[in-house]
Regions:
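Short nucleic-acid-contacting surface segments enriched for D/E, G, S/T with interspersed K/R
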Residues: 394, 436-454, 497, 543-561
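Non-catalytic protein-protein interaction segments used by genome-maintenance enzymes to assemble
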Residues: 213-274, 544-551
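A non-catalytic, helix-rich entry segment at domain boundaries
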Residues: 66-223
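OB-fold nucleic-acid-binding modules
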Residues: 364-411, 464-518, 547-548, 557, ...
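Metal-dependent nuclease catalytic cores in nucleic-acid-processing enzymes
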Residues: 263-297, 450-454, 558-560, 565
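OB-fold (S1/OB) nucleic-acid-binding surfaces
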Residues: 405-436, 511-542
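Charged, glycine-rich intrinsically disordered N-terminal tails and low-complexity linkers that flank
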Residues: 1-106, 220, 226
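Metal-dependent nuclease catalytic regions and adjoining charged, substrate-binding loops involved
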Residues: 14-16, 209-210, 234-237, 264-267, ...
Length: 589
């Protein structure tokens, strides 16, 4: 096998954590949002407070997948020149654009909250065809360069049927490469019918144009792979999912695909995004530096290049990103107040700002632009019994007992491997576990000892109370008074609050569905509940999703009894249990 280097564009979490997004990790999108507006990041990534879906958001997803499917195709041997490749690809582009347009229409119809002044039908099929053609033209620049370089350094090995990279570029004639193949029980998902295959010339023959396409094909996110295809920082606190990596000439060039134009409101974030990817590549590839980083814009076929960070800049970025990650973890926790005073809101000028610009002054006057009319039209909430304000929900507590029954790491209810144990007080016992992988690695250090647990988070799972430990929690041996804060108030296990009765109005709502790492489907609905003073994310999974939830829209009133109390990254998250939670709704109209 030819040596293509350790150019692996995907990896596994170092502590075995979730492959997908995690609120505890720094990602490129979280970073760029934070750099634009920290409060926008707080509400979007910590509170889950989103805006309505726009056609452009769906367009970016379906276009990227269609473009990647095009790159997977195998040109015929007889094709000649760049124009010949364009002619061969045109009917494929029309078919892929039609497929993408239908997929976008379905996604638009299934979205729970869409903008009112735009519609998916505003995007014509011709628009998608033109942008896929633009993507093709951007790639053909690489194909021509590869042809002019006699196929590049890997032509000989590829003609012999060898794969120069451990993670190959996806193509029609090869099966998909899963990050966790053992988690895919369906063997059919791991195979791929070879309906077509590349045609290679004998060794020593001049390179053909179809071979240049095959050699120049980059790695990209394989649309056949349902598992996240990410890079993970060795220390576990950062991850990123690259769009495309060019490797054909022995260099590493990182590319991000954009469906719009370079002059969009979010365009200024591209350089920060690519610098993060270049830094992450360096951190995950034994100090290897990328040779280039580019943005490919499909509206107009624009290629925007940036200078790659050098060694000194990489070191500065490491410190900067670690500091930002730390600031994110300590920015806020518990129940989030909303609205905030004007001095805590943003000015609303950064791309994506909406909820973060809303504020209310001491005279009760609202300030902001986006969503201002929505919140102003919502009436005050009547908090009569049995309902209580969100701010009354019990946060961190202190408990003590005997630590026993240690276990793990084993999967929690999110499928994340965590450490756990049992805390026993008299005849009562409760399960305690890490809030996420690596959050409290010393959990087992006081096995079979009497301990004091400080700043732990109460929750519930399958109708049984639990306690969660994170980086802010602490454990000391009972009796070590010098380590115990004075006047600490302990909570009896039987008095831990695991459910709440809440009421308020819906501010935002969204739904997601997909396939888990093991190939099983999942679905989720989440909305932001506002009681007039605070907000909380409310989530429902699988069988807990009913038509009443799917019919909710911003401004609707909702009353819930018996909703589960949970925490994600220390921020309140309420969870609907179809067996225990009772729901009443009233439409704003």
């Amino acid at each position: 096998m030819a040596d293509g280097g350790d150019a692996l564009p995907v990896g596994l979490p170092p502590r075995g954590g979730p492959l997908g997004r995690s609120r505890g990790r720094l990602s490129a999108s979280a970073l760029t949002t934070y750099l634009r507006c920290p409060r926008q990041w707080l509400l979007l990534y910590q509170a889950g407070m989103q805006g309505p879906t726009r056609p452009s958001q769906i367009l970016g997803v379906v276009l990227e997948e269609a473009f990647c499917e095009l790159l997977m195709m195998h040109p015929p041997e007889e094709v000649e020149g760049v124009d010949g490749l364009r002619h061969w690809a045109l009917p494929l582009i029309v078919s892929l654009a039609s497929k993408a347009h239908l997929a976008g229409e379905r996604a638009w119809e299934e979205s729970l909250w869409n903008v009112e002044d735009e519609a998916w039908s505003d995007l014509s099929l011709e628009t998608l065809i033109a942008r896929l053609q633009a993507g093709l033209d951007l790639f053909l620049v690489e194909v021509k360069a590869c042809f002019d370089a006699d196929g590049g350094p890997y032509l000989s090995s590829m003609r012999q049927g060898e794969q120069p990279f451990e993670v190959p570029a996806p193509c029609q004639s090869a099966p998909p490469s899963f990050p966790l193949p053992d988690k895919v029980p369906d063997a059919a998902l791991r195979r791929w019918p070879m309906s077509e295959s590349p045609v290679w010339q004998p060794q020593g023959a001049p390179v053909k144009w179809n071979e240049a396409w095959e050699c120049a094909r980059p790695w990209f996110k394989d649309p056949r792979v349902h598992q996240p295809q990410r890079l993970y920082h060795p220390e576990g606190w950062a991850s990123g999912e690259l769009d495309l990596v060019l490797r054909w000439d022995g260099r590493i060039r990182i590319v991000d695909i954009k469906s719009g134009r370079p002059g969009s409101a979010f365009a200024s974030s591209l350089e920060h995004q690519l610098r993060f990817y270049a830094w992450l590549w360096h951190e995950t590839h034994d100090g290897q530096h990328a040779s280039g980083m580019e943005g490919w814009y499909l509206d107009g076929a624009a290629r925007v290049s940036y200078d790659v960070p050098d060694a000194d800049e990489i070191n500065r970025l490491s410190s900067q990103y670690a500091g930002i990650h730390q600031d994110m973890q300590t920015m806020v926790e518990g129940v989030l107040p909303f609205p905030v005073p004007p001095d805590l809101a943003c000015d609303g000028l950064a791309a994506g700002c909406g909820w973060c610009s809303l504020s209310k002054d001491g005279n009760g006057e609202w300030n902001g632009s986006t969503f201002l009319s929505l919140v102003q039209d919502i009436p005050n909430v009547s908090l009569n019994s049995p309902y209580q304000p969100l701010s009354f929900i019990q946060g961190r507590v202190a408990v003590k007992g005997r630590l026993t029954g240690t276990w793990g790491p084993l999967p929690n209810h999110f499928g994340e491997p965590v450490l756990g144990a049992v805390l026993v007080v008299g005849e009562q016992h409760i399960t305690i576990e890490e809030s996420e992988p690596g959050a409290f690695p010393t959990l087992h250090s006081h096995h079979e000892q009497d301990v004091v647990l400080l700043d732990v988070l109460p929750g519930v799972w399958r109708d049984q109370p639990r306690l969660y430990l994170d980086e802010r929690s602490s454990m000391i041996r009972d009796g070590e008074n010098k380590l115990q804060p004075p006047d600490v108030q302990f909570t009896r296990l039987g008095l831990l609050r695991t459910r709440a009765n809440v009421t308020g109005h819906v501010l935002s709502i969204g739904g997601r569905s997909g396939v888990r790492v093991d190939g099983k489907p999942w679905s989720m609905v989440s909305f932001i509940l506002w009681d007039g003073a605070s907000i909380a994310e409310v989530v429902a999974f699988g069988s807990s999703i009913n038509q009443r939830l799917l019919d909710l829209r911003p401004g609707d009133e909702i009353r819930m009894t018996g909703v589960e109390i949970g925490w994600r990254s220390g921020v309140l998250q309420l969870r609907i249990d179809n067996r225990k939670t009772r729901i009443e709704t009233a439409s704003k109209s």
